[in-house]
């Protein structure tokens, strides 16, 4: 009897303890899978081209950032502005799924900075004005010490319209209906950026629908560094520049 070992999310399972368990199987074949692999000079690197994964229908065709943003944003509340854009997109996508008879409820992922209780309150307040809340199971919270309405969130027809997170969902989270990211968190390292974007790139039914709205994923953010990084990853044509009114340029999360 011989074993072949497959380790998913290997970038976070590359530890002495994990290696000790692997060695118990006395295998000569170990496959480590990750979007952000840790370099192992002894391993053979097999890279799967993004185009091949798209062609198989496993991930979305394009990442769209700040779609149709005006050159100057006129708003008193940047957070609510981003959330409104995201919710409008969610409703637009959901209506097409309904018209096609497809039971998918696209999920908005709202990523907060650390130490942002006031910002979390503001996010919940906005969603409450739209009838999205904990009580009716349409809002989920996945924060340290606070997990609400997480059950069945990965189901394509889950009731949750939005989930509020910080870091926990970025790695190893499997929710293919996640399609829209509102990124309020800044200053993440490149590995974390890749993992975060990856959360909204899966196709809910592992196939494309020949409809741009359904086959694309969407990000709404005012994080300039992240916008530049995402431009590099998805193509500059997917981005429109955003200019903030002078009185809001000192705003910090």
Feature roles, as predicted:
Residues 4-6, 109, 164, 182:
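Structural motif
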Residues 1-4, 11-32, 37-159, 177, ...:
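Helicase-associated low-complexity regulatory tails and linkers flanking the ATPase motor
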Residues 164-179, 196-200:
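SF2 helicase motor core recognition
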Residues 8-12, 169-170:
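Catalytic acidic motif of RecA-like/P-loop NTPases
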